[in-house]
Each structure stands twice: as structure tokens, then as C-alpha cells.
Amino acid sequence: MEIDFVRLTGSIAYATLFIVAAGWDAWTRKIPNWTVAALAVLFLFAQLLTWSTPNWLSSFSAFGLVMLAGVPMFARRLIGAGDVKLLAVAALFAGMENLLLLLVATAIAGGALALVALAARPYAGVFGGWIRTRAGIPYGVAIAAGALHVGTTTGMLAISQRLTHLQL
């Protein structure tokens, strides 16, 4: 088993950036633009280095579809702008092939997060009123969970390659 260090570095960067965005969103309810920009740059490097990402057309189609649906939702204040941008950059990595998987995994994680938030409300005093004073849930956490699920399920985060030689 050979370890592909470029893939290993990319996988660590992918996971780290999504985890940082999720943590930042959980703490401040804002997703920093630099995390989204860094993920977009990572996607470009992944494409150039032939990492396990979908082709350009598939990736940008998924990105465009998420933006097309997300911008009106942001305009109606149903979702934050950072959430739309983070989901769109996650869609770049997922491509059209795995966009449904990304959206379903994100929705399931969001539902679980909402249940945890509801269950934690009676204990708001323990958290210094943090739960009660903040409306909604930090959906960046759910988006990051969905993106990490897609990364592990599709093999995008695999750090080794098994080389098979066929003799005909």
C-alpha cells in the first residue's frame, strides 16, 4: 500500500477547512469568507492534480444549481449567505454525481442538530443563555458534516491507492 502524500495533504486540508468553518459558525454564527475561498482554491488544486473530484462541468453545474437555489433563500432570510457559499463550495467537490448525497446528508445532519438544540433548551442556564439568545441553528455544522460524509463515502478522502496489475 502506497501513501499518496499529495492526496493526504489535500484530504487533511479539506477536512480541516470544513471543521474550522463548522466550529466558527457554531461559535459566532458566521462562516468566514477565507474558509470558503481556501476550499475553492483547494478544489482548483484538486482538479489540476487529478485528485478524486468530478470533472469541471459536473462540479460547476452543481455549484451553479446550489447558488441558483440558495441566493433566493438568502434573500428571503431562510438561510445565511455563508451557508449558501459553504454549501456551494461543497457542491464543487461533490459534483452533480453526488449532489443529492450531499444535500441529503446535510439535511439529516441539520435535523439532528435541530433536535439537539431543542433538547438543550431546558439547560440554557447552564450555557449562560447562549441557546435562548440565538435564533436558528448554525447550519454550517450540518453542511460540514454532509461534505465530510460525501468525502468519505466517495473515496475523495482516501489517502492510499491500491495498485493492481493485470496480466493478460
Task: Name every feature range the model reports, one short phrase each.
Residues M1-I79, V84-L168:
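A membrane-topology feature that recognizes alpha-helical transmembrane segments
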